[in-house]
Amino acid sequence: MHCESPIVRRKSRQIMVGNVPVGGGAPISVQSMTNTETTDVAATVEQIRRIQTAGADIVRVSVPTMEAAEAFGLIRKQVNIPLVADIHFDYRIALRVADLGVDCLRINPGNIGREKRIKAVVDKARDLNIPIRIGVNAGSLEKDLQKKYGEPTPDALVESALRHVEILDGLNFYNFKVSVKASDIFMAVAAYRKLAALIEQPLHLGITEAGGLRAGTVKSAIGLGALLMDGIGDTIRVSLAADPVEEIKVGWDMLRSLKIRSKGVNFIACPSCSRQNFDVIKTMNDLELRVEDITVPLDVAVIGCVVNGPGEAKEADLGLAGGTPSNLIYIDGEPSQKLTNENLVDNLERLIRAKAAQKQAQLEADAKNIIARA
């Protein structure tokens, strides 16, 4: 019932964002961006920690002013996850946060200014071994490109990116990644596909300003999913008008669904119908909240009846197939025990945690054996 992923990753250079490798065959990293006032250090630190707990590899922070830059320095001292500073308009802010411990600088070609200013940022980044993201956005293209193309197009996005790739190449600076974001799915996908064939730098994927939690998730899943299935992309950010924690959850769900990278419990659940022997929807909602702290990859099937229940349950690490008078639990493909509907969620949580602990212990033992044989 399981099909191996046919995805072949695009080859790219590798950069390091803090201790996280991006590109060069490294696992695709998941990131989000804070939406607090950066000058509110306590609130921003608290949000970064929640984002990290949700599974983020990297967090971006907007730094619009010098006051925010000083706050960024205080934030940097209080968190232990790689931080990207999002810089627009004033290149001097980039120079300042570089001295304050930033792990990556995001600059926007559409508003960062003349090549002289870019060179100043590059020189500072080179001295401190800080990578840069060239972040092209359809909503803020350079004025000459707006005039040339009349409106944002995939070619306009790519031309903007290549213009700044050429500048950095000319400065013998290769420690950078690139993004070409648009809110239009077709525009973004076309731009990324074209750019992926033209450069060897790692690509940061995103559908910008995708929308609220539901619509934004759908748009991002379609756009990023298409690119990821092509093997394009080295780090992703799902842009949602929602709690940044939700961006991390959706990002991980995408990677998990495409069998690119796994973390936590992957639920396989039926949509439910009148054949269900227990309330599938309520059971799922409760379980997802209860076990979201589990990080070990684990497939759990929750199927309400005997039509597809046994088949799906056998394929999972742990599966529940609804039945009358009792539901049947499968562990590693074998029938294990029966559960009634009484305290069903409590019992399922207990079994899931036990299986996760067993799998974690096995992973650790395997890792030790590999080290011992090396």
Swiss-Prot record:
InterPro entries per the UniProt record, alphabetical: Dihydropteroate_synth-like_sf, IspG_bac, IspG_bac-typ, NO2/SO3_Rdtase_4Fe4S_sf
Coiled-coil spans in chain: none
Cofactor: [4Fe-4S] cluster
Residues that coordinate or bind [4Fe-4S] cluster: C270, C273, C305, E312
GO biological process: isopentenyl diphosphate biosynthetic process, methylerythritol 4-phosphate pathway; terpenoid biosynthetic process
Pathway participation: Isoprenoid biosynthesis; isopentenyl diphosphate biosynthesis via DXP pathway; isopentenyl diphosphate from 1-deoxy-D-xylulose 5-phosphate: step 5/6
Enzyme class: oxidoreductase
Tree of life domain: Bacteria
A molecular function (GO) term: 4-hydroxy-3-methylbut-2-enyl-diphosphate synthase activity (flavodoxin)
Keyword line: 4Fe-4S, Iron, Iron-sulfur, Isoprene biosynthesis, Metal-binding, Oxidoreductase
HAMAP family given in the database record: IspG
Role: Converts 2C-methyl-D-erythritol 2,4-cyclodiphosphate (ME-2,4cPP) into 1-hydroxy-2-methyl-2-(E)-butenyl 4-diphosphate.
Family recorded in the similarity comment: Belongs to the IspG family.
NCBIfam families membership: ispG_gcpE (TIGR00612), PRK00366.1 (NF001540)
Protein's name according to its UniProt entry: 4-hydroxy-3-methylbut-2-en-1-yl diphosphate synthase (flavodoxin)
Record organism: Cellvibrio japonicus (strain Ueda107) (Pseudomonas fluorescens subsp. cellulosa)
